[in-house]
Swiss-Prot record:
Classification lineage: Archaea, Methanobacteriati, Methanobacteriota, Stenosarchaea group, Methanomicrobia
One of the record's GO molecular function terms: ATP binding
Protein name (record): CTP synthase
Gene symbol of the encoding locus: pyrG
More about this protein: CTPSs have evolved a hybrid strategy for distinguishing between UTP and CTP. The overlapping regions of the product feedback inhibitory and substrate sites recognize a common feature in both compounds, the triphosphate moiety. To differentiate isosteric substrate and product pyrimidine rings, an additional pocket far from the expected kinase/ligase catalytic site, specifically recognizes the cytosine and ribose portions of the product inhibitor.
GO biological process: 'de novo' CTP biosynthetic process; pyrimidine nucleobase biosynthetic process
Catalytic activity: UTP + L-glutamine + ATP + H2O = CTP + L-glutamate + ADP + phosphate + 2 H(+); L-glutamine + H2O = L-glutamate + NH4(+); UTP + NH4(+) + ATP = CTP + ADP + phosphate + 2 H(+)
Pfam family, one: GATase
Species of origin: Methanoregula boonei (strain DSM 21154 / JCM 14090 / 6A8)
């Protein structure tokens, strides 16, 4: 197994995840099997209970793992499915070591950061790297992104584990890529001093960067590269410019042009294979149409809904249609403005804030024949809206929101749950699709597997009344409602699951593909 460790310096939010995913895509384009691990140096066990406004989207894996959004980037760029073991947190590591100590596994030793914590970190990395793909094969290369910034106290045990692994691995099985900021001053000059200090901090920990990826707003020129090469003691070819791209899927192509593949091949002893051009053709595909979609949401931060944004992009690219997204605050938007959009999307979420605005948008889409896609909470609110305005249940609501007729109720198995973390209905579940429905048209098969993250469901006591008034539940998991739709509407479709988590640039999610196609067919904007 060959390992590529990715660290970051100067500041957080530089794009280490996109850099790591892009490196993986470059190697995959050359025929190598690639997997990825994300290290998050926080004490949380996982990302499930973290505030999305601070941390961004909680991405859900097939096994129900609630993880950092970077794992979503890995899955999309590499077209793989990861598991919870591919996300290593300080909380997981410490919990495991403490459990071992309580069992007596250390035979009376004094348990310390070194060697016990670092040994557990190395074990977690190796176990994740060795997991097999569905076809029974294993990865040739494992990417390991170390979250945080070099110098942070939280990252120290992980960086020490990386240092130890360098000594334990063959010289051609290890490479360290350091992502750093090259800012522009008021005169427009690119400054290398932050990079120099970042590399110095890395060296103080016993680590040496084999490749430096320079993040900047514009291309880093030859003179700046030479300066970084000289001061950071590595070949000029190992200084890679990574300017901010218009589209993140273009980053692998830009890094390929910088020659990073050849540098990696030399360090890792990889055969230099021809590059598969299919990624280039996909990313450079031209748009011939454009639609505008309103996303009525609770949070005004795009990273909270990054998988939705990417799924719309995947569908648009497949249909040669550029999808422009307009974010509407569910509590503040003007209802009359909804007529200006080709489609309306209601994303998932939790809590009561903003739900009436979302319900109003759903009603507008239903009554005015505007293409609508609802996801998770959007599915539940579509049920509530229909119950209120078509079934005459004026106080229809969800048990999550308070008193009223609970057309949305708590899942029975949730009634005994006392902890928040990792206790929802999470991960892959199978749904059976009814024949002659929109769901069947979208998926083209009678059984599907999609990822879930919820505690509430359609109350079985109201299903008959809802269906009598025309609502169709077109997919179910046993007695649970998974999809709903409205016959006679151009596109009114909602899912209890999150189809965006399985969308890929090469394989768009069927509900998103159908939604964008309906937006294009019912275009209102210019």
């Amino acid at each position: 197994m060959k390992y590529i460790f990715v660290t970051g310096g100067v500041m957080s939010g530089l794009g280490k995840g996109i850099t790591a995913a892009s490196v993986g895509r470059i190697l995959k384009n050359r025929g190598y099997r690639v997997t990825a691990v994300k290290i998050d140096p926080y004490l949380n066990i996982d990302a499930g209970t973290m505030n999305p406004a601070q941390h961004g989207e909680v991405f859900v894996l097939k096994d129900g793992g609630e993880v950092d959004l970077d794992l979503g980037n890995y899955e999309r760029f590499l077209d793989i499915e990861l598991t919870s073991s591919h996300n290593i947190t300080t909380g997981k590591v410490y919990r495991t070591v403490i459990e071992k100590e309580r069992r007596g596994d250390f035979l009376g030793e004094t348990v310390q950061i070194i060697p016990h914590i670092t040994d557990q970190i190395k074990t977690c990395i190796r176990q994740a790297a060795e997991e097999t793909f569905p076809d029974g094969t294993k990865a040739d290369v494992c990417l390991v992104e170390v979250g945080g910034t070099v110098g942070d106290i939280e990252s120290m045990p992980f960086l020490e584990a990386v240092r130890q692994m360098r000594g334990e691995l063959d010289e051609h099985d290890y490479v360290l890529v350091h992502v750093t900021l090259v800012p522009e001053d008021a005169m427009g000059d690119l400054k290398t001093k932050p990079t120099q200090h970042s590399v110095k901090a890395l060296r103080e920990l016993g680590l040496h960067a084999d490749i430096i990826v320079c993040r900047s707003e514009r291309v880093v020129g030859a003179n700046t590269k030479r300066k970084i090469s000289a001061f950071c003691d590595l070949p000029l070819s190992a200084v890679i410019s990574a300017a901010t791209a218009r589209d993140t899927y273009e980053v692998p192509m830009e890094m390929e042009k910088e020659g990073i593949a050849d540098v990696l091949s030399t360090h890792l002893g990889l055969e230099k294979k021809e590059t598969d051009p299919s990624w280039y053709r996909l990313v450079t595909k031209e748009y011939t149409n454009r639609v505008t979609v309103a996303i009525v949401s609770k949070y005004g931060i795009e990273d909270v809904y990054i998988s939705i944004k990417e799924a719309l992009k995947h569908a648009g690219r497949a249909l040669s249609t550029e999808v422009k997204i307009v974010w509407l605050d569910a509590e503040r938007y003007e209802p009359c403005s909804l007529k200006d959009y080709d489609g309306i999307l209601i994303p998932g979420g939790f809590g009561k804030r903003g739900i009436e605005g979302k319900i109003g948008a759903i009603r507008f889409a239903r009554e005015n024949k505007v293409p609508f896609l609802g996801l998770c909470l959007g599915f539940q609110l579509a049920t509530i809206e229909f119950a209120r305005h078509k079934c005459g249940i004026a106080d229809a609501t969800s048990e999550e929101f308070g008193e009223g007729s609970h057309v949305i109720a708590l899942l029975p198995e949730q009634e005994s749950v006392t902890e928040l973390g990792g206790t929802m209905r999470l991960g892959d579940y199978t749904s059976d699709i009814r024949d002659k429905t929109l769901a069947m048209k979208l998926y083209g098969k009678s059984q599907i597997i999609e990822r879930h993250r919820h505690r509430y469901e359609v109350n079985p006591h109201y299903i008959e009344k809802l269906e009598k008034e025309g609502l169709v539940f077109s997919a179910t998991n046993k007695n649970r409602m998974e999809c709903l739709e409205l016959p006679g509407h151009p596109f009114f479709f909602a899912t209890q699951f999150h189809p965006e988590f399985k969308s890929r640039p090469t394989r768009p999610s069927p509900p998103y593909l159908g939604f964008v196609e309906a937006c294009r067919a019912n275009k209102r904007t210019t």
